[in-house]
Amino acid sequence: GEWITNPNGTLTMNPFLEYMVENSDKRHQINTTVYGLVSIPWIKGLTYRLNYNYTLDAKNLYNYSRYEASQQGEASKQHDNSSVWLLDNIVNYTNSFGKHAINATFVYGASRQAYDNTLAKGQQYTSTVTGYNDLGQAIIQTIRSSAYKESNLYQMLRTSYNYDSKYLLTATLRRDGFSGFAENHKFGLFPSVGLGWVLSREAFLSEAEFMDNLKLRASFGVTGNQTSRYSSLAKVELNAGSKYVFGDGASTSIGSTVMRMSNKDLKWETTAEYNVGIDFSFFKERLTGSIDFYRATTKNLLWDVIIPTMTGFSSVRSNVGKLQNTGLEIVLGGTPVKTKDFQWNVRLNFSTNKNKVVSLLGQDTDGDGKEDDLVASGLFIGESLGTIYDYEVEGIWQLADKENGTIMKGFYPGTYKIKDQNGDGEITAGEDRVILGHKEPAYMMGISNDFSYKGFELRFFINTIQGGKNGYRSKIAKPDYIGKSIGNAENLSWLTAYDYWSPRNPNAKFATAWLSPTVDTNRMQNRSFVRLQDVSLSYNFDQRWTKKLGVSNLRLFISGQNLLTFTGWDGWDPEAGIGFTTDSYPVMRTYAFGIDLTF
């Protein structure tokens, strides 16, 4: 006989066959928590606490389908076991002497995470009776297993001092160790110190009755970022393509291949941050807020540095350079109107952050007096981590360009016209790519409003992310019919299918869907947006009325999320950078209506 094909000529499996399988999914979890607290009687304020937690997850997944593996059956058994344990020893001392208050905490702890997996699989069965309980009768048999473990060891000493609730001091010293780093660099030392001054408690401000609270803060601290497990070690794999013969006349054996380079100098990425801030509350908390300014310098960034292909590897995990982040965060809250029956509360948050690469490898191989960029890794001195370095699109090649011979070699009418930056008549990666902008936004802001009138309450929240002139940019996917069969729309950008180039649509926004030039790229778009994210309207019934019904509280509400989005982004979601593709989804617009009852 002949296979029954789909209308478009493909042999895609009938989705209902997925229900004609024998599955078993058994999961077991064990959680153990041990907690102990001891107060030392002969030293006032001294305590010891023990925290221990252990979690074990075990999964047994069995599957059998007689229609898989070319209609001859496929079965598998998979066993997964993962465990995590955490142990903390905590010594704490707290005491006060008149206007002085002190606190000291010492922590010694450790944690470990482990995972083990085994999969046995069989394909093409002579009998369908035993299914996954007799994998040995399968013609094609596969066995795979994997395992990993990682551990942390840490100590921390924190002390704090408080004088008359006006002058505050906190100092911390933390030592962290992680198994994923190189042998001689597993531990990092991270100090921090913070100062606080509550001005509103000072005598010289005692007559400022409008002031509820005014506090100045300043801090400095160092934090660490750990790498992934085993990333400092070389990765070696058995490879059927790397066979060898040991001795004359011997049979071939499967050899091993080094798939990733080791780095014996891999160590902690560290960030030193300065922060100054102010907290305030005025007019009996009718106006509240906080303002923070920070500058953070990160050294020894953990980065997969691109290396020459002649080494046999594409990249190596390394510590590189220095990165600086500077930012401002503002939170404001207020009650502009407050009467007996009506109240309006508003809250605004604003944040902006700019980062730039200060240094990289410290090399000047071209002798121009400037430190070299790591172009292959996308790192540029003086630019942000999210720098977009690509070809610049300045239009679309037209039929007239081909007719008059001005079209570049390797391009066709309907393909993107890439700007020839050096004017040599060719488009090359080394000479014609430029910095087009940055992925990071210029600022983020949100504002919430809460209006209440008697039993009614209206709330809404507006969220916005703005990119400024060249920020918060991403590529928007173009149509992708190339190499696809009729009716197959994998990775197709639906939006661009409505405005792609054709002889009848020469002024289209996007390139043709049918041709691929020698050098290709996509247009960049700004993802800035303003979104009405949450809205709710509710009514609380008077308790004098609800009590007659035997109900202490009765509330009706209606709400909606993601109701409106204003943006120039051609795609489903500007915040996630998702275009109109078949493997992505829009932000869901949801509505809800409900009743809250309390008896």
Regions found by a protein language model. Name each.
Residues F451:
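Short, structured surface segments that line ligand/substrate-binding pockets
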Residues G1-Y64, E74-I388, K454, V519-F599:
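Extracellular/periplasmic, surface-exposed regions of secreted and cell-surface proteins
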